[in-house]
């Protein structure tokens, strides 16, 4: 080789050659990923990030620096760098003119045969991300039905009379079910209801307009249909999305609506309502919860017509992490009884579940319902909801139902509870006799499982048809007890607080709190099992002032005063101070920061 050729094509070290080859491979891989994404019709940021992260992990800092140097040399002299990176064929020398006239490789457009194939793992990620993006984009592409935006005097009267606050006031309440702009196949199911409840009337216009909503309302206010009607209506317009084949040989349909609930009983109840409503348009709902085997639930999820899932956070996260539940196409997410889920310690599970779903930028609509509006719920809403409309029916503080008659009996001796219990059972059934056509239902609450078992035995010995509902029972036994109580086979049900929240048991005429719960929140939700759907009810509470009850006396009396209930004079001997609530982990020294910014996710390469 002549001196001129040496100058034109300087000899490079092995490391520099290797770095240039890596740079070429990286450019080709990026170009191939872009072409594959263009063929799918989707160019999402997630695909770019995944491909970029995969490539960056395989490169060291030293190679990155050398690649930058090579790129600079190519920009200055493309023909020289191209000639240097190409190995000349054996037994054949290239002239200087031939080298300079050759087209640089770095600027050439690769053909299909030259494009390097992505790895199987990258192809799977690309296909999954493309399918999810297509599903959420189709949800966003569906136009929202037209709803009125002008408030009339009738609307303002409705809001005032029901003590409803809209923040901000964008949509007036929908006062007639027949005015709902929904799928015509769904309308006959709703026509059996005379009129919407306050939370339904205010939620439907905003949710049908594809807005995120936070609903704060008392238990028994019809929240299931408040979020269920817009969700099922949206899915009735969306095409089903088929997932990829899983390791067990199952081909599951991807879920498009996810509802999270704090307890198995509430999840089962919401599932029943959504199943009945979804049947009108051929949608199937699956309920997933712990306490039973996963295999049966996984088989149901694998059915192609399964598009709605109602579940508890623990089992939902378990199935999502194992790949048996695909949440990448969820376009409608509901957090039901959000305050209860946070109280039960499910916040981390909820955050991990939401991480499996698309973001609101990809078209996901998020709905959150709660009985109260504490700081923990506000923080969760600010993180995952996009400029939500907040609907408050009544107060956002804890308050009891004013339609429930409250009777408080202060007992000096806890042993008097059994006698007073049987007295109230007999008195109530005398006024409201039990019959097959009009069963009388009485709900008795105990604090602990052993106490529930003892009370069940005591009531049965007194000659009443009684069942039980507590944590030591199998899931099958719990279902049977609930069904017997709902159908009237057993008119008395003894339960722990596992049944105190969210259960919609029709026509519960009397609630008896044998032992006061550990919090006033649980007291309100226990009493909320009666007086539902606009009806009246009655609650009897035995109060002894022992153990935890003394410290809750002040808050208990505040709840009674708010609903205008009579407070016995015997309560005067208990302190009226309302104790500051303590954080479960940090105690009384925990500081809530309502204006704290949302957490930022930081990724380290």
Curated annotation (Swiss-Prot):
Residue ranges with Polar residues bias: 104-114
Q: Where is the composition biased (Basic and acidic residues)?
A: 45-55
As its record notes, the protein acts as a catalyst of:
ATP + H2O = ADP + phosphate + H(+)
Record domain Helicase ATP-binding: where: 204-391
User: In this protein, which residues make up the domain named Helicase C-terminal?
Assistant: 424-575
Biased composition annotated in UniProt, kind: Basic residues: 56-66
Looking at the UniProt record for this protein, which Gene Ontology cellular component terms does it annotate, in alphabetical order? nucleolus; preribosome, large subunit precursor
Q: Which family does it belong to?
A: Belongs to the DEAD box helicase family. DDX5/DBP2 subfamily.
| UniProt name for this protein | ATP-dependent RNA helicase DBP3
- The species is Cryptococcus neoformans var. neoformans serotype D (strain B-3501A) (Filobasidiella neoformans)
């Amino acid at each position: 080789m002549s001196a001129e050729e040496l100058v034109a094509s300087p000899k490079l070290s092995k490391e520099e050659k290797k770095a240039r080859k890596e740079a070429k491979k990286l450019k080709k891989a990026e170009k191939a990923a872009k072409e594959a994404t263009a063929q799918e019709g989707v160019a999402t940021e997630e695909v770019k990030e995944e491909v970029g992260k995969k490539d960056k992990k395989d490169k060291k800092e030293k190679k990155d620096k050398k690649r930058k140097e090579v790129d600079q040399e190519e920009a200055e002299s493309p023909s020289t760098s191209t000639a240097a990176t190409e190995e000349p064929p054996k037994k054949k020398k290239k002239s200087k003119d031939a080298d300079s006239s050759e087209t640089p490789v770095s600027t050439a457009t690769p053909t299909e045969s030259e494009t390097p194939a992505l790895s199987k793992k990258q192809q799977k990620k690309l296909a999954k991300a493309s399918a999810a993006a297509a599903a959420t984009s189709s949800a966003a592409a569906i136009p929202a039905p037209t709803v009125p935006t002008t408030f009339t005097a009738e609307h303002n009267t409705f809001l005032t009379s029901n003590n409803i606050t809209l923040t901000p006031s964008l949509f007036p309440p929908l006062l007639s079910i027949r005015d709902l702009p929904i799928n015509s196949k769904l309308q006959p199911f709703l026509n059996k209801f005379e009129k919407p409840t306050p939370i339904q009337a205010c939620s439907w216009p905003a949710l049908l307009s594809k807005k995120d909503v936070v609903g704060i309302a008392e238990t028994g206010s019809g929240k299931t249909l408040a979020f269920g009607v817009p969700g099922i209506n949206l899915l009735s317009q969306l095409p089903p999305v088929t997932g990829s084949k899983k390791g067990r040989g199952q081909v599951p349909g991807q879920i498009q609506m996810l509802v999270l609930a704090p307890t198995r009983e509430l999840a089962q109840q919401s599932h029943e309502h959504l199943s009945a409503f979804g049947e009108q348009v051929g949608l199937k709902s699956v309920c997933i919860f712990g306490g039973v085997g996963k295999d049966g639930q996984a088989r149901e999820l694998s059915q192609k017509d399964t598009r709605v899932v109602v579940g508890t956070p623990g089992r939902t996260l378990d199935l999502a992490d194992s790949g048996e539940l695909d949440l990448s196409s969820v376009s409608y997410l509901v957090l039901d009884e959000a305050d209860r889920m946070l109280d039960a310690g499910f916040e981390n599970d909820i955050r991990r579940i939401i991480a499996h779903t698309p973001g609101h930028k990809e078209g996901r609509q998020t709905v959150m319902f709660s009985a109260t509006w504490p700081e923990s719920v506000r923080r969760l809403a600010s993180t995952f909801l996009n400029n939500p409309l907040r609907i408050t029916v009544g107060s956002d503080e804890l308050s009891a139902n004013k339609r429930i008659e409250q009777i408080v009996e202060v007992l000096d001796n806890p042993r008097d509870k059994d006698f007073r219990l049987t007295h109230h059972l007999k008195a109530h059934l005398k006024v409201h006799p039990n019959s097959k056509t009009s069963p009388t239902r009485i709900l008795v609450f105990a604090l602990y499982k052993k106490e529930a078992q003892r009370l069940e035995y005591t009531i049965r010995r007194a000659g009443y048809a009684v069942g039980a509902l507590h944590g030591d029972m199998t899931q099958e036994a719990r279902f049977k007890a609930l069904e017997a109580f709902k159908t009237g086979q057993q008119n008395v049900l003894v339960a722990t607080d596992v049944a105190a929240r969210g259960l919609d048991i029709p026509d519960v005429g009397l609630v008896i709190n044998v032992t006061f719960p550990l919090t006033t929140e649980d007291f309100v939700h226990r009493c909320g099992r009666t007086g539902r759907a606009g009806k009246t009810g009655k609650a009897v509470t035995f109060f002894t002032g022992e153990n935890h009850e003394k410290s809750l006396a002040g808050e208990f009396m505040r709840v009674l005063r708010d609903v205008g209930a009579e407070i016995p004079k015997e309560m005067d001997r208990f302190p009226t101070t309302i104790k500051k609530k303590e954080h479960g982990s940090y105690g009384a020294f925990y500081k809530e920061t309502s204006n704290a910014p949302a957490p930022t996710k930081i990724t380290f390469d």
